């Protein structure tokens, strides 16, 4: 059976001799955060899946797989900084050598003082995320129960607003919140589906 060993690394130089002798410090949200959950799924599990035995473990023992692939260190290098992304940004500004885990909108809003991290040589910018090239990003799915349309007041109007150009178009107000709009062809497809109340089965 494959075995895991304890991680004794305190500095980046401990990880790789070519890296600087800088203390490892990662500021991020607690387990209750959706951002933390997304990071665990996309980044941490993404790394796990590069090891065949861990990938196989997911099928054999999901509980152990999750314990291995979603656990963060509790001996100092990972610091839970709460669910306030602004606080993480402030701490990164104070310590440029630290890394942070937070939403894309905060990166854009503070691009004058912090920068995104490359993942496999790809920078987290608008185009790379829109094209699915940045691995630590994911699509947002918006589901509506068709039976609720006409029953729950405002549901139809909310659906139209959420899928409107002014909300999620290229210059929509939701882009200011960190959402990356779909390419024109896909946007048109889902906007039409929302207007016609096309079911998920029919859409696929």
State where each predicted segment sits:
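Flexible loop/hinge segments at secondary-structure junctions
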Residues: 1-204
């Amino acid at each position: 059976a494959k075995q895991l060993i304890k991680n004794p690394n305190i500095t980046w130089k401990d990880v790789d001799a070519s890296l600087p002798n800088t203390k490892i410090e990662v500021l991020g949200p607690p387990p209750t955060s959706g951002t933390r959950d997304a990071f665990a799924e996309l980044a941490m599990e993404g790394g796990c899946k590069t090891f065949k035995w861990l990938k196989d473990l997911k099928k054999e023992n999901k509980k152990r797989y999750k314990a291995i692939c979603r656990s963060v260190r509790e001996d100092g290098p990972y610091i839970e900084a709460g669910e306030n992304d602004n606080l993480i940004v402030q701490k990164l500004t104070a310590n440029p050598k630290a890394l942070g885990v937070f939403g894309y909108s905060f990166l854009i809003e503070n691009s004058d003082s912090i920068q995104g991290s490359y993942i496999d040589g790809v920078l987290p910018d608008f185009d790379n995320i829109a094209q699915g090239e940045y691995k630590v990003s994911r699509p947002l799915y918006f589901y509506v129960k068709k039976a609720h349309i006409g029953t729950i007041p405002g549901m139809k109007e909310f659906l139209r607003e959420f899928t409107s150009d002014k909300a999620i178009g290229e210059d929509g107000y939701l882009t200011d919140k960190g959402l990356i709009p779909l390419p024109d062809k896909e946007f048109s497809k889902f906007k039409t589906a929302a207007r016609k109340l096309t079911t998920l089965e029919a859409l696929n």
